[in-house]
Each structure stands twice: as structure tokens, then as C-alpha cells.
Curated annotation (Swiss-Prot):
One Pfam family here: DUF3754
InterPro entries: DUF3754 (IPR022227)
Protein's UniProt keywords contain Nucleotide-binding: no
A single GO BP: hematopoietic progenitor cell differentiation
Claim: Transmembrane is one of the keywords in the record: yes
Record-listed Phosphoserine modification sites: S329
Membrane topology, from the record: Multi-pass membrane protein
Keywords: Membrane, Phosphoprotein, Transmembrane, Transmembrane helix
Entry's Gene Ontology cellular component terms: membrane; mitochondrion
UniProt-recorded name of the protein: Transmembrane protein 143
Protein localization: Membrane
Amino acid sequence: MTVARWLRLWERGQAMLHVTWGSKVRLWSLVPALLGTPRALSSLENRMGVYRKMWNPKEPCDWAQQYRERFIPFSKEQLLRLLIQEFHSSPAERAALEAFSAHVDFCTLFHYHQLLARLQALYDPINPDRETLDQPSLTDPERLSSEKDVLQALRPLLAQANFSPLSEDALAYALVVHHPQDEVQVTINLDQYIYIQFWALGQRVGQMPHKSSVGSKRGFFRKLPPVERRYFKRVVLAARTKGGHLVLKSFKDTPLEGLEQLLPELKVRTPVLQRALLNLMLVVSGVMIFVNVGMVILSDLKMATSLLLLLFAAFMGVKASKVFGQRRSAQALELAHVLYYRSTSNNSELLSALALRAQEEHIKEALLAHSFLARRPGGSQGKPEETSRWLQSEVESWLLAQSGCDVTFNGPRALAHLQALTPSLGLFPLPELPQLDPMVLGTPEATQAALGSSYPSP
């Protein structure tokens, strides 16, 4: 091969490398434009730096203002029994409320079934668990664009299900602060993530369920008594790693400080105190072995001191590596065991679960609005703003008295749900039923055409 030919091949290789690298740079530069930066990770790192400088923070800054509980802490059946006991004690009133509840069930069924079908159609091209025949693979920009559409369609459904988004400050607190009774701790590399978003409902402060706690029942030398912790009954995660895909997962009974344990890319690490205790135990045992065995070897085998120290250091290094490896394996197994019980649904199944939860919250809001407005002089007559404010105040006070939970009730939305119900029983819901997201549900003309058809086949 001549020098000139070699130079031409080298220049061609440099040009191909430039094109390949340029395409990768252009692809990742599209990520903020396609996803709208759901989580600015650089800003998240800055917030994490603030919490690292704090001494033993107990909760995120201004947590009471950051997180407002909106979940109604009763099932539909429990709420129906409470409303009957409180406001509909006569047989006629009870029958009327039960008929109204069945009417709301019927009116919302088609609405959320259609919403779920549209949402699953959006998610199907990027579903990693698809069991049907393989479809043509998407390019990275197409996949990112599809993920953006799914997340945009998912947010109003989560809002109707009364999930509250966790702020960037709360996530920074969760990534930095570790509870002292969490024996298993993990670490993540933010550079591996494109976006991270959490939603939560059902905040509780108390002892966590046994199978959902990670190492909180034992210390290093003795058992530790259970302590009260801040945790959530349900948590939804949406995360995307570089080179990966959109991860949608739901978990139960998750502590605020344990959110990072739910992320897809993590490494188990040994806490500093446990690492120090293990090192101390290794040093003490090593000194005892050296005193009891090393001196005998020096005197009997006439081995050089430097060689003996070298062999002893190698032996202790192997032993330390084995001890720490076994410790990390045990912690990883315990974390996997706990996540097995915490996990409730993921990916496509999560969409179905969210649609059912949103429908139930929709029904509960309509039942509360119906029962409380029936007690109000004039009912729903008057200005909508005044009516919704009165409804919100009355329902929040009643929920606090019944459950002890400070719940923020969405009065305007509940009033809109009540007013959108069909005027007579036995009919499909009218097109005026509030749409959670026009992009998901389609145009009003398409909805009208669907509603004008006969009963759907079972």
C-alpha cells in the first residue's frame, strides 16, 4: 500500500467518524426540544448540593406548601356508606343515592374506556413489553417524540386520579438524604438519565408495613425498634435513561427518602458507618492472625519480614473484597425482595390501572358534590365560583373530620363533573362530558360519531 493511498483511506475514515459523531450530537441536542425538559437534571444537581450542605434535614424545604394531598382516602363503597349514614338516612334517600351512584358509574365507563384505548394506541409503538408481532423499529427521534406524546397524555389522567407531582426540590432531598434505619442504600449517576418524574398520593406518617421496609427491622449489632416515617401509599415513576426507553412503574408504601431505590439504573452501596465497622473488624482479625500465625512463620520458616507483610496484605485484601462483595450481594437481594412486594404495575398495565383509579376518583368527586349541594340552600344555583368555593370548603372540612387527613378538594372540577352528567338514566354520556385531554380523546366530531352508534359489543 502506497503512502498516498494510505492517506486517502485515513482522510475517509476521519470524515466518516465526523459524520457519525455529528449525528449523535444532533440527536441528543433534540432531546430538550422533543421532551420539553421534564426534569432539568442540571438544576436538580444544584438542589442536591444545597441539601448536602444541610445538617440532618428531616423533610424538604417548605414541604407543606410543596405537597398538597388531593387523594380522597376512601373507596367508592366506603364513601357511599358514609354519605348514606350522614345525609341519606331514609330509605328513599338511600335508594336515590344508590341509583345516582349507578348512573355515574354508567356515564363514566365509556368515557374512560375510550380514553384508555387512545392512550394505549399512543403507547403501543414504544411498549417494551409488547407481545404481538414485531413492528418496524423506531428511530431515536421518533421514539423520543412518541414518549413526549405519551407523557403529555398521561399528566391529565394522573391529575384526575389525584396524584400530586413531586417537585424537583423533593426529588433532590430524596436523592441526598438517607434514613438511618435504611440498611440498604443505593447511588445513581444522573448523567445516565434524560428525565426523571415522580407522582405520589396518600401521604402517611407512621410505621411502614413490614414487607415494604428495607432493613429497618435490624441494626448492625441489635434489633432497632420501628420508627415513624413519611411515606406514600402509591408512587408513579416515569424515567428515561440514555440508550434506554421510557420506564413507567407504580409502587406502594414508599418512603420519601427511598424514592431513589425505584429508579432503573442504580448501584447498591454500603453505608459509611457499616463500611467503617467492617474495616475495623477486618483490621482487628488481621492483627490477631498476624500475631498468632505470622510470628510462628517468621521463627520457623525464616521468611523475610517484607515478604510476609506482602503476603499478609494480599490475603487481607482478598478477604476484604470477599466480605464487602457478600455484603453488597445480601443488600441487593434484600432490595429486590422489598421491591417485589412494593411493585404494583408497570408500562401498559399501569395505564389501565391509572384509568380505573381516575374513574373512581371522578365518581367519588361527583358523589360528594351531589350530596353536599343537596344540603345547600339553592343547590347549585348562583355564581359557579361561589358555589365551587363553598363546595370545596365544606367537603374538605367533612373529609378532615371523617378521616383525619387534610385533603385539598377540587371544587370546580367536581362541580363540572356533576353538571356534565346526562340528564336521564339509561343513556350514554353526552359529548359535553369533560375531556381530560383533547389530544387523547380525539375531536368532538369523532366522539359524537362514536356515541351515535349502537351499544358496544361485549
